[in-house]
Design a protein with these regions (language model features):
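Domain-edge interaction signal
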Residues: 1-171
Protein backbone atom coordinates (compact mmCIF):
# COMPACT_ATOMS: atom_id res chain seq x y z
CA UNK A 1 0.00 0.00 0.00
CA UNK A 2 1.24 3.48 -0.75
CA UNK A 3 1.96 6.04 1.90
CA UNK A 4 -1.03 8.22 2.59
CA UNK A 5 1.07 11.30 1.76
CA UNK A 6 1.61 9.95 -1.79
CA UNK A 7 -2.14 9.52 -2.19
CA UNK A 8 -2.74 13.02 -0.84
CA UNK A 9 -0.22 14.48 -3.31
CA UNK A 10 -1.86 12.59 -6.17
CA UNK A 11 -5.32 13.78 -5.09
CA UNK A 12 -4.14 17.41 -5.23
CA UNK A 13 -2.52 16.72 -8.62
CA UNK A 14 -5.70 15.07 -9.96
CA UNK A 15 -7.84 17.95 -8.71
CA UNK A 16 -5.64 20.57 -10.35
CA UNK A 17 -5.30 18.53 -13.54
CA UNK A 18 -9.04 17.90 -13.95
CA UNK A 19 -10.44 21.22 -12.76
CA UNK A 20 -7.76 23.59 -13.99
CA UNK A 21 -7.95 25.30 -10.58
CA UNK A 22 -5.43 25.38 -7.77
CA UNK A 23 -6.20 23.16 -4.80
CA UNK A 24 -4.56 25.63 -2.46
CA UNK A 25 -3.74 24.62 1.08
CA UNK A 26 -7.28 23.58 1.98
CA UNK A 27 -6.60 20.88 4.54
CA UNK A 28 -10.30 20.39 5.31
CA UNK A 29 -11.01 19.58 1.66
CA UNK A 30 -8.02 17.23 1.52
CA UNK A 31 -8.97 15.36 4.69
CA UNK A 32 -12.61 14.84 3.73
CA UNK A 33 -11.77 13.86 0.16
CA UNK A 34 -9.36 11.23 1.49
CA UNK A 35 -12.10 9.94 3.79
CA UNK A 36 -14.42 9.65 0.78
CA UNK A 37 -11.62 7.92 -1.16
CA UNK A 38 -11.26 5.33 1.61
CA UNK A 39 -15.02 4.79 1.69
CA UNK A 40 -15.19 4.66 -2.13
CA UNK A 41 -12.44 2.04 -2.31
CA UNK A 42 -14.28 -0.11 0.21
CA UNK A 43 -17.45 0.25 -1.88
CA UNK A 44 -15.81 -0.54 -5.22
CA UNK A 45 -13.23 -3.21 -4.39
CA UNK A 46 -13.92 -4.15 -0.77
CA UNK A 47 -10.48 -3.30 0.60
CA UNK A 48 -9.06 -0.10 2.13
CA UNK A 49 -7.16 2.27 -0.14
CA UNK A 50 -4.54 2.87 2.55
CA UNK A 51 -3.54 1.97 6.06
CA UNK A 52 -4.10 4.56 8.69
CA UNK A 53 -6.98 5.53 10.89
CA UNK A 54 -9.16 8.59 10.79
CA UNK A 55 -9.97 10.39 13.99
CA UNK A 56 -13.41 11.88 14.52
CA UNK A 57 -12.58 15.55 14.96
CA UNK A 58 -15.25 18.20 15.31
CA UNK A 59 -14.60 19.27 11.69
CA UNK A 60 -14.97 15.70 10.40
CA UNK A 61 -12.70 12.71 9.74
CA UNK A 62 -9.00 13.57 10.03
CA UNK A 63 -5.84 11.58 9.36
CA UNK A 64 -3.51 12.95 12.06
CA UNK A 65 -0.37 12.24 10.00
CA UNK A 66 -1.65 14.68 7.37
CA UNK A 67 -2.76 17.39 9.80
CA UNK A 68 0.02 19.75 8.68
CA UNK A 69 0.40 18.28 5.18
CA UNK A 70 0.62 21.59 3.33
CA UNK A 71 2.76 23.32 5.96
CA UNK A 72 5.27 20.53 6.63
CA UNK A 73 5.39 17.80 4.05
CA UNK A 74 3.66 18.73 0.82
CA UNK A 75 5.64 17.73 -2.21
CA UNK A 76 3.78 18.37 -5.47
CA UNK A 77 3.04 15.13 -7.30
CA UNK A 78 5.06 14.67 -10.47
CA UNK A 79 3.54 12.75 -13.40
CA UNK A 80 6.73 10.66 -13.51
CA UNK A 81 5.70 9.26 -10.12
CA UNK A 82 2.55 7.65 -11.56
CA UNK A 83 4.19 4.23 -11.41
CA UNK A 84 4.29 4.52 -7.61
CA UNK A 85 0.49 4.26 -7.55
CA UNK A 86 -1.58 1.48 -9.04
CA UNK A 87 -4.23 2.17 -11.66
CA UNK A 88 -6.84 1.27 -9.04
CA UNK A 89 -5.50 3.85 -6.59
CA UNK A 90 -5.46 6.52 -9.29
CA UNK A 91 -8.96 5.52 -10.45
CA UNK A 92 -10.42 5.78 -6.94
CA UNK A 93 -8.84 9.18 -6.30
CA UNK A 94 -9.92 10.46 -9.73
CA UNK A 95 -13.50 9.30 -9.01
CA UNK A 96 -13.49 11.23 -5.75
CA UNK A 97 -12.20 14.35 -7.53
CA UNK A 98 -14.98 14.07 -10.13
CA UNK A 99 -17.65 13.49 -7.48
CA UNK A 100 -16.55 15.93 -4.78
CA UNK A 101 -13.95 18.28 -6.26
CA UNK A 102 -16.50 20.98 -7.01
CA UNK A 103 -17.37 21.45 -3.34
CA UNK A 104 -15.75 23.59 -0.67
CA UNK A 105 -14.11 22.00 2.35
CA UNK A 106 -16.85 22.97 4.81
CA UNK A 107 -19.57 21.44 2.63
CA UNK A 108 -17.54 18.22 2.32
CA UNK A 109 -17.02 18.25 6.06
CA UNK A 110 -20.76 18.55 6.58
CA UNK A 111 -21.32 15.54 4.29
CA UNK A 112 -18.70 13.49 6.13
CA UNK A 113 -20.19 14.35 9.53
CA UNK A 114 -23.46 12.76 8.39
CA UNK A 115 -21.68 9.42 7.97
CA UNK A 116 -22.29 6.70 10.55
CA UNK A 117 -18.56 6.20 11.03
CA UNK A 118 -18.02 9.82 12.11
CA UNK A 119 -21.13 9.92 14.30
CA UNK A 120 -20.11 6.68 16.03
CA UNK A 121 -16.68 8.16 16.75
CA UNK A 122 -18.29 11.01 18.68
CA UNK A 123 -21.32 9.51 20.48
CA UNK A 124 -21.02 11.50 23.68
CA UNK A 125 -18.38 14.07 22.85
CA UNK A 126 -19.47 17.60 23.61
CA UNK A 127 -18.85 19.96 20.71
CA UNK A 128 -16.23 21.97 22.58
CA UNK A 129 -14.22 18.85 23.52
CA UNK A 130 -11.46 17.93 21.09
CA UNK A 131 -10.66 14.43 22.38
CA UNK A 132 -11.18 12.48 19.15
CA UNK A 133 -11.92 8.79 18.86
CA UNK A 134 -10.97 6.66 15.88
CA UNK A 135 -13.42 5.96 13.09
CA UNK A 136 -13.80 2.20 12.98
CA UNK A 137 -13.07 0.55 9.63
CA UNK A 138 -16.19 -1.60 10.13
CA UNK A 139 -18.28 1.59 10.35
CA UNK A 140 -16.66 3.00 7.20
CA UNK A 141 -17.54 -0.31 5.50
CA UNK A 142 -21.17 0.22 6.54
CA UNK A 143 -21.07 3.73 5.08
CA UNK A 144 -19.57 2.24 1.90
CA UNK A 145 -22.62 -0.02 1.48
CA UNK A 146 -24.71 3.12 0.88
CA UNK A 147 -22.51 4.35 -1.98
CA UNK A 148 -24.06 4.15 -5.43
CA UNK A 149 -21.30 3.38 -7.89
CA UNK A 150 -21.52 5.48 -11.03
CA UNK A 151 -20.05 4.31 -14.34
CA UNK A 152 -18.91 7.42 -16.21
CA UNK A 153 -18.32 5.44 -19.41
CA UNK A 154 -21.94 4.31 -19.70
CA UNK A 155 -23.40 7.27 -17.75
CA UNK A 156 -25.35 5.01 -15.41
CA UNK A 157 -25.31 3.83 -11.81
CA UNK A 158 -24.26 0.19 -11.66
CA UNK A 159 -27.28 -0.76 -9.58
CA UNK A 160 -29.47 0.35 -12.52
CA UNK A 161 -27.86 -2.07 -14.98
CA UNK A 162 -29.58 -5.31 -15.77
CA UNK A 163 -27.46 -8.31 -14.94
CA UNK A 164 -25.33 -9.48 -17.83
CA UNK A 165 -26.08 -13.13 -18.51
CA UNK A 166 -24.15 -13.66 -21.74
CA UNK A 167 -20.59 -14.79 -22.25
CA UNK A 168 -17.61 -12.59 -22.81
CA UNK A 169 -17.47 -11.33 -26.37
CA UNK A 170 -14.50 -12.47 -28.40
CA UNK A 171 -12.71 -9.85 -30.54
Amino acid sequence: MPKVSQLASYLVYSYENHTGARFGDNELRLQTMLYFAQRECLAVVGVPLFEGSFEGWEEGPVLPELHFFFEEGYDPFEPLEMKKLTEREQFILDRVVFAYGQYEGWYLSDLARRETSWRNSRPSVAEEVTEPKLLELADIREDAKKVRIYDTLFDVYLDELEEFEGGVLEP
